[in-house]
Each structure stands twice: as C-alpha cells, then as structure tokens.
Regions:
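Bacterial Sec-dependent N-terminal signal peptides
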Residues: 1-45, 542
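Solvent-exposed strand-loop boundary residues in beta-sheet-rich modules
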Residues: 92, 269, 459, 535, ...
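Short, compositionally biased serine/threonine- and acidic-rich segments at solvent-exposed termini, linkers
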Residues: 535-546
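Acidic, Gly/Ser/Thr-rich repeat motifs that build Ca2+-stabilized beta-propeller blades
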Residues: 44-241, 319-324, 329-337, 423-466, ...
C-alpha cells in the first residue's frame, strides 16, 4: 500500500500507511460529566492552561472576591463578598507584588449601621458585597466618576443554628463617587488617598436571601432611550424559592410586577420624574426607572408606574455582559441551572426565559411528572404536570443561546443526592472576548464554580454559538479546571492576550451539602487574583474545523480538527509545488518532527506529543516557508 507520508523522528525514517479515520465524537457534555463525576476517584485531568498561558498570582488573602472589573484608569476593581470592601490593584501588578495588600477604596462596616449581621452569622446571604459597574464617562467627565455597587444590607429573618426556616434579607444598589487623591473635594483626611464614597441609593429594599441573589451589574456601552443616557442592568435571582431551606418561599420569577427572578434596567442618573402620587416602592424609585422600560405595573391603581423589570423567568443569573459582534451589540447572561441545564442567554426586553416552568432547552422535555421517572417531577418544588415544549410555545419563552447538560429525563439526579456531582458547571459569571488570541475573537468566556472556565465561540451574527468552530461547541482543551472561578476581567488591549480571574475563597454552596457557614469546603488558590498571559502572539490562524470531510481551503493549507487528539488531517491547494516539507515544532521553534509528502491531502499522527500548543510549518518544493499553523494537542 502506498505511503501517504514519510516521517523522520529522532533520525529514524519510517512509513505511515493510510487507513480509514474514525469520526471523533468528543461530546462536550459527556466529557464534562465524566470529568466532574470522577473527581472523587482522583482521576488525572490534563489541564492545558499552562500550555497556553503563563499564570501568576498577583494578589491573595482576599475576603471572598466576587467581582473583578477592568477599570478605565487601567486598574482592576474587586469586590469582597464577605469583606464588604472594594479594592483596586494596578493592571501592571506582577507576581512579585502578590504579598502587597490591594488598595482599599471602600469598606462598609459589618454588624453596625445598615449591615445588621457580621462574619459570625451562621447563615450568610448568598453573595454579600456583589456586583460593580463603572460609568463609561468615568475618565472623560470628572463629574461622572461614578461606580455602582449592589450589596445585601439587612437580615430580617434567618435563624441561626440548624433551623431550616426561610431566610429573608434585603439588598440595595448604590451610586458611588470615586475621588483620586489629587481630586478637589476629596473627603479623606490629609494626606488624601484614593477613595470611593456612596452618594445616592438607586434601589433599596430589594428582595434578598441566603440563596440565588444573583447580583451582577453592567452598563450599556452606548446611550439609549428617549433621554439618550447610559443604562444600568442588574441580575436578581429567585431567592432560592422552592428549594432547600427556602422551599416554602413563593417563586415570583414569572410575576412581572415583582423583582425576583428578573433582569432589571435602570438609569445611571436620576431623570427628575415627579411623584405619581401613589404609595409604592416603584414610585419611590421612579427617577431611577427608565420611562421606556417595557412594563407598567399590572394592578390598576399602580398602572401609572413603570417597573424596573427588563426580562423575567430567571433562576440565578450571576453573569451579564454586553458584546459586539460585527457591529451589533447584544446583552448576554449566564445562569445557574437546577439539577441540570445551566444556561447562556441573549437578553431581550419583555422576554420570558422560562424559569421555574422550564429548565434549559424546552425541546428536550426533561422535566415532567407525565413520564415514568421520579427525579424530574418538580422544578422549584412545583409539579411539572405538562410538556415543557408546549408551555414554552404557549408562553413565548426565549430559547437559551446555549445550555449545558440538557440531560435526558432518566438521568436527572434525585433530590438530596450529592449536589457536587449534579450535571451542572455552576456558571458564576460571563465576559465577552474580542481580542486577537487565535480563534478566540467574538467568544463568550463563562466562569465556573465547579470546573474553571469555558469559551463559547459565537457565529458571525452573534446570536448563536458556532458549533463549527471546534470539535465540540466549546473548547476541548481544559482551562483552569482545578480552580473555582468567581469572575473574569479582560484586558482592553486586543493584542495583550491577558485576562484576570478571581478565585472563590471556599467551595461551599448555598445547598445543604456545602453547608451554610461557607468555611468547610477547601478550594485551590482560594481568595486570589490570577493573571493569565497568552504565551505567544504569532501571525497564525487557529482553524477550528470539526468536519471529517474536506473543508473549504482559504489559505494554502488547512489543518483539522483543531484541537486534536491523535490525527491531524491536512488539505492543501493543488498549485503547491511538491514535495511538501512539513515540520512540527514547539512554541520556541524547536523541531520535534518533520516529513515529506507528494500529495495535497494527507494526515499526521501526533498521539506521541504531550498535551499543549504546537506549530505546524509548511515548506513548498522550492524550500520556501509558505504557511504556519498553530494547533492544540489534547
């Protein structure tokens, strides 16, 4: 049989014979479930993060970091959920400075004043000090150095000890003014220092809980509405209504008059609206509620009031971000599922996202009391005695952009089982990447409390995940899979290849398996800021073509699949002068393999390579280097 390619490895020459390739079915869902399930068996999980990125710890000993945001003054802003602090570090900070405490710009005291609980509380609200967003004109207008914060500020009923009673907290959103040390009016004592001061309350008395507060903030990157101003968006969860110690709490995610289980849309500055003359919190907040919001209150006496509700039917959306794909801005969100079906959604106004009537994709009907399985009968403690698909169609539900583990009905785990093995990734936040890491442009980065970081490559329209961008819908190489990641911030420099993550201080959850104290489950590198720097930027295209059939060639040669497990296929243009010399090198250019082919289509066996990133160099028959491709070996 004729050899396709002659290889020289370490000076030994041998022939590779052609054979029929098996189609690769590396399903993301199966991969993830198996990886999660075998943790207890101490299986070795190959993490390719260090193959692609340099990782440095630049700060540590943070008090349950919850938010990390890249600020317009090139600082990283971090909120501490249990420290009730806002701190800053320079984006240029290195590992040599990791023992230097971050700069504290705001601290709200616990156990006194408006925060009527402290660290000794047996049941902590989910979150605490939560989301942070910085006004787009922070640096261009000295009068708009505004920062917005959300935090839980009042415990009304949440018994300590072993009681299984419902926990009632209250949450607020505030507007702050930031002062540099040299700014006129800086309120700090001499010598002045950078400081953040609360100047107004946007919303107060919002529902709060020890579960599903959500609490993420973002600001539209463009001015909108009849007042032509930036708008503030806030995720607020369903309070854990219908589960664990809140199982008797009413779930209001489908009630558009309330704030639970919603995404809210607010003004970034008061609009001056006069009172509507009715006694209601929406009247109290009227100057912060945009006049073009989609809903008026449905009760007749309050119908003059706009509500802050932008979308509804959310369970626990802890991530929200704007992204621009090919000139179109979209609002994206990540949301925790129940026992399965975590979601990534495109957020639209006046739109129903299904919870607690539907979990994840409505078409799979994996929650129902009408089938033969017992573990999938309820959502939020309510009987699902209907078809999810029928309900979604009848009620105009928006289908998720992406859902993890749209598990079959027979596979839904039982209530009371170990929640750490449930088929979920626990998506804690989301960000949008439009930089120049090869193959990553226009991707959503979804952080996970169970399994690190995932990338979803969007199609050119921005409204679907590009399932043709890699062998699986998300990257098949693991990223930060040993860490419990709370949030991610991305450098605005498209060529820096730099982003930062904050790691949760413990592995505790809101459920009974994790415990309520938040102190009994260890996690890797807890309470740190990790800086990830892409190892090299080369003029390469990272082609991610999963088709086993021949792809369309845009350059002289194309390789697929990428990432690869064992076999790389190469497809070249026929006008290439033969013979072709192919070399495989590491990222430092050191030659590992080389071979010669007289054909346009051939394959390379790379199973002997260690997991990581490699270069494939192509030379034509004249000895001219005509193309370099980068590929990932799993």
């Amino acid at each position: 049989m004729k050899s396709l390619l002659t290889w020289k490895i370490r000076g030994v020459t041998f022939d590779l014979l052609p054979y029929h390739m098996k189609k690769l079915f590396h399903s993301f869902f199966i991969l993830l479930f198996l990886s999660l399930s075998v943790i207890s068996l101490k299986a070795q999980v190959v993490d390719s993060t260090t193959s692609l990125f340099n990782i440095d710890t630049i700060a540590k000993n943070l008090g349950y970091p919850w938010e990390i945001t890249y600020g317009p003054e090139d600082s990283l802003w971090i909120t501490e959920a249990r420290g009730y602090r806002v701190v800053r570090v320079s984006s240029n900070r290195t590992a040599a400075q990791k023992n230097t405490p971050p700069q504290q710009v705001l601290k709200i005291p616990l156990g006194a004043g408006e925060i009527n609980f402290d660290r000794s509380s047996n049941r902590w609200p989910q979150g605490g000090m939560q989301g942070l967003a910085i006004h787009p004109e922070f640096m261009s207008d000295i009068n708009k150095r505004w920062v917005y914060l959300s935090y839980v500020y009042k415990k009304q009923a949440c018994p300590n000890g072993g009681s299984n009673a419902t926990c009632i907290f209250r949450t607020k959103i505030v507007q702050c003014r930031f002062y540099f040390a040299t700014d006129a009016g800086n309120p700090t004592s001499l010598p002045h220092r950078d400081t953040l001061t609360i100047i107004d309350t946007v919303l107060s008395n919002l529902p709060g809980s020890n579960d599903h507060n959500s609490g993420r903030l973002t600001i539209s990157p463009f001015k909108e509405g009849p007042d032509d101003e930036y708008k503030l968006y806030y995720t607020i969860g369903d309070m854990g209504a219908g589960q664990f110690n809140n199982d008797t709490r009413v779930n209001y995610a489908q009630n558009i008059d309330t704030c639970e289980g919603k995404i809210l849309r607010l003004n970034t500055e008061p609009d001056g609206d006069a009172s509507f003359g009715v006694v209601h919190e929406y009247n109290t907040w009227r100057q912060w509620i945009p006049n073009d919001n989609p809903y008026n209150h449905s009760v007749a006496v309050f119908n003059v009031l706009k509500t802050p509700v932008y979308s509804f039917g959310h369970r626990n959306a802890q991530g929200i971000v704007w992204g621009n794909v090919n000139g179109t801005w979209r609002l994206y969100s990540s949301e925790h599922g129940d026992k399965s079906d975590d979601e990534v959604n495109t957020i639209l106004p006046a739109t129903n996202y299904g919870w607690p009537k539907v979990a994840g994709l409505e078409s799979d009907n994996n929650y129902s009391s009408l089938d033969a399985f017992a573990n999938n009968d309820r959502l939020a403690n309510s009987l699902i005695n209907y078809s999810e698909n029928t309900w979604a169609t009848t009620n105009g539900m928006q289908r998720p952009l992406f859902a993890t583990f749209n598990w079959a009905a027979s596979a839904i785990p039982a209530d009371g089982s170990n929640i750490f093995t449930w088929p979920t990734i626990a998506p804690s936040s989301i960000d949008f990447y439009d930089g120049n890491i090869p193959g990553w442009k226009n991707s959503l980065l979804v952080t996970s409390l169970k399994y690190g970081l995932y990338r979803l490559k969007l199609k050119s329209t921005g409204d679907y995940v590009d399932s043709a961008s890699s062998l699986n819908i998300v990257d098949t190489f693991p990223l930060l899979h040993s860490w419990r990641i709370r949030d991610v911030a991305i450098s605005p420099n498209p060529n820096s290849g730099t982003f930062w993550v904050v790691t949760d201080s413990t592995g505790s959850t809101s459920g009974p398996t994790g415990g309520f104290s938040g102190s009994n489950i260890p996690t890797k590198d807890g309470g740190k800021i990790l800086k990830l720097s892409y190892k090299t930027f080369l003029p390469l295209a990272l082609h991610e073509n999963p088709r086993v059939g021949r792809p369309i060639v845009k350059d002289l040669i194309q390789i697929f699949p990428n990432p690869v497990v064992s076999i790389i296929n190469l497809h070249g243009k026929k006008e290439l002068k033969k013979p072709l010399l192919v070399q495989i090198c590491d990222l430092y250019g050191r030659l590992l393999k080389e071979g010669i082919s007289y054909q346009n289509d051939f394959f390379i066996e790379v199973s002997s390579l260690k997991p990581g990133a490699y270069l494939l160099k192509l030379y034509n028959g004249y000895g001219v280097e005509v193309q370099i491709e980068k590929f990932i070996k799993l």
